[in-house]
Amino acid sequence: MENQPKLNSSKEVIAFLAERFPHCFSAEGEARPLKIGIFQDLVDRVAGEMSLSKTQLRSALRLYTSSWRYLYGVKPGATRVDLDGNPCGELDEQHVEHARKQLEEAKARVQAQRAEQQAKKREAAAAAGEKEDAPRRERKPRPTTPRRKEGAERKPRAQKPVEKAPKTVKAPREEQHTPVSDISALTVGQALKVKAGQNAMDATVLEITKDGVRVQLNSGMSLIVRAEHLVF
């Protein structure tokens, strides 16, 4: 008997589950909420198939249920399904709210990463001198003055007005920030700033978690930020 091919990544496992249970899993588009306890059903149904282990199934389920398209599908009125697509009860309000918060946090993280990447690109471009200097204006040839005839009186040269040196404009002093060294010293409601490249955005502490600090920006967006991106 030939050996079955082995699935090496969670994405490959999800593709296999979408083909094996098309009424439950989907490889693209909006996903349907899964039955609570579906992991054990998977272990019972696909044990040994494609050399899948429980660890692989658990990792694939975690990736599937944290994807944006799955979180979009967790909404009021949606129904959970089992492996065969049979309904297994409507979603409760607590699960819907949890999915909504996860989706907002994921979007905020992506937006912060994009802002940081754009700031780094601008810094790199400035350092490399990618901006081209304006082209120099061509000099016009100086007009030739007629030579003075012998015996003619020399006209006195007009004195040039003394030009005043232009006043130097002092560059605005760059705002200094103090990094946050200990997040346990922070308090809920405390004002601080979130660094994004060379910029620092005003924010307020909402919660201190094991992964970092949940803050709310002035725009109303909330996100979890690591300590190295926080300053006073």
From Swiss-Prot:
GO terms for molecular function: RNA strand annealing activity; RNA strand-exchange activity. Residues 137-146 have a biased composition (Basic residues). GO terms for cellular component: cytosol. Gene3D superfamilies: ProQ/FinO domain (1.10.1710.10). Residues 105-182 are annotated as: Disordered. Pfam families: ProQ (PF04352), ProQ_C (PF17516). It is found in: Cytoplasm. Keywords: Chaperone, Cytoplasm, RNA-binding. Residues 117-136, 147-177 have a biased composition (Basic and acidic residues). SUPFAM superfamilies: FinO-like. RNA chaperone with significant RNA binding, RNA strand exchange and RNA duplexing activities. May regulate ProP activity through an RNA-based, post-transcriptional mechanism. HAMAP family: ProQ. Belongs to the ProQ family. This is RNA chaperone ProQ.
